[in-house]
Amino acid sequence: MIDKSGYRANVAIVLLNRQDRVFWGQRKSRTSWQFPQGGVATGETPLQAMYRELYEEVGLRPHDVEVIASTRDWFKYDIPDSLVRSREPVCIGQKQKWFLLRLKTSESNINLEANDSPEFDNWRWVSYWYPINHVVYFKQDVYRRALTYFKEYIN
């Protein structure tokens, strides 16, 4: 769902383990790593989209996690001009509703092949602030904003 300004509605997930380390996924067939994220479908709430993406990308169900917090506002980032597609509707970036979750069940429930088109082919737990400097450059600011927003909920 792309708004009139050219931003695609999206959800992003910060998944914590019991040690407050975060899930960090390597994108399939790429060298880049990121948090789980994905678009909000027409007629879908951000919460519904988050649970759908959580299952599609990480293989976890609602009973596997606790929702700790979500951002009140949508956080935006622009994509580089070289990645903007020329066909309609033009998407210049993403506006994201962020969710902070805690894993309640065993990490053995994480399944990167829960659907037919996996997003990730590898994952690991990393320190809370690690992703800011290791995500693709054009997402660094939005990652910093989200992690700073959620910091008050971390032990």
Swiss-Prot record:
Pfam families tied to this protein: NUDIX
PROSITE patterns per record: NUDIX (PS51462), NUDIX_BOX (PS00893)
Cellular component GO terms held in the UniProt record: cytoplasm
UniProt key word Repeat: no
Enzyme Commission number, as recorded: 3.6.1.-
Similarity-based family: Belongs to the Nudix hydrolase family. RppH subfamily.
Name of the protein this chain belongs to: RNA pyrophosphohydrolase
Highest taxon in the source lineage: Bacteria
Keyword Hydrolase tagged: yes
Function: Accelerates the degradation of transcripts by removing pyrophosphate from the 5'-end of triphosphorylated RNA, leading to a more labile monophosphorylated state that can stimulate subsequent ribonuclease cleavage.
Cofactor(s) required, per the database record: a divalent metal cation
Enzymatic class: hydrolase
GO molecular function: mRNA 5'-diphosphatase activity
Renumbered ranges of motif Nudix box: 38-59
Keywords annotated in UniProt: Hydrolase
All residue ranges annotated as the Nudix hydrolase domain in the record: 6-148
Cysteine disulfide partners in this protein: none
InterPro entries (UniProt xref): Nudix_hydrolase, NUDIX_hydrolase-like_dom_sf, NUDIX_hydrolase_CS, NUDIX_hydrolase_dom, RppH
Biological process according to GO: mRNA catabolic process
